[in-house]
Amino acid sequence: VSERENLFSREIIMNQRDVSMSWEPDALHEECGVFGMYDFDGNDVASSIYYGLFALQHRGQESCGIAVSDTFGPRKVDMYKGMGLVNEVFDQEKIQSLKGNIGVGHVRYSTAGDSVISNAQPLVINYVKGTLMMAHNGNLINANELRDELAYTGAIFQTTIDSEVIAYLVARERIQSKTAEEAVVKAMKKLRGAYSLVVSSPRKLIGARDPYGFKPLCIGKRDNAYILASESCALDTIDAEFVRDVEPGEVVTIDANGIKSDKTLCMKPEEQARCIFEYIYFARPDSYFDGVSVYDSR
């Protein structure tokens, strides 16, 4: 992968040649991997995110990226993302250049839509409330409708992925909400589909799972740091302890005070639905989803 194909954050470069002007959602953009980490002691998290993404490589081989920020200093985002495998896009020098104790990472796989650098994640949105970093796994069935609604109110889209629709929706709701987690809950009320999200707003790491529980997301802990990951195998890679799964419909907020949960959108167990392909195809055999071993389920 050439350096020109990569995207180095401090100046986020959008190559308009890579951006489709027509909206073509990634209809089968479902097997991606997300990873987020917040180290309360101020240690850089890029290296741990790298290894977490490496463990999730089976979930996406087209592109990958890491975005980090420092909660103890100015809200400046360092990001690097590129086309290819995790170990192809990142080397030690690039990882060490990403300074920050909170961050999100993503590996992408799609069978429809554009496989270009502009569609690589994480996404970084700068808006009136600050900066939002987001990684998304899943697919929205009402992405066209939401995109049109946002576009008519002034949103300018730079990608062809439904993930950007979610990011703009969260940013818009944040302007009218007291907290970032409240904005995520409001945004989720408008989303239709299967998804898991990892969002970083100033000094908060937020994880969310669709109300049906179609896409997985779990919580881990290592020393004085918390982790959110698509699969438990990513926690094992960085010697983190598995805490629990994020419940379907739950929004988990991690900040200096620990973890808090919003279960406003949680559904009854009999109304929930899991993706069978996570157990028989997508996930690594050594992962666990909602207390079930992927290996045993196969």
Task: Cite the ranges covered by each PLM segment.
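Flexible, polar/acidic helix-loop-strand segments at domain edges
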Residues: 1
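Conserved short alpha-helical segments that host acidic/polar catalytic motifs at enzyme active sites
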Residues: 4-248, 253-298
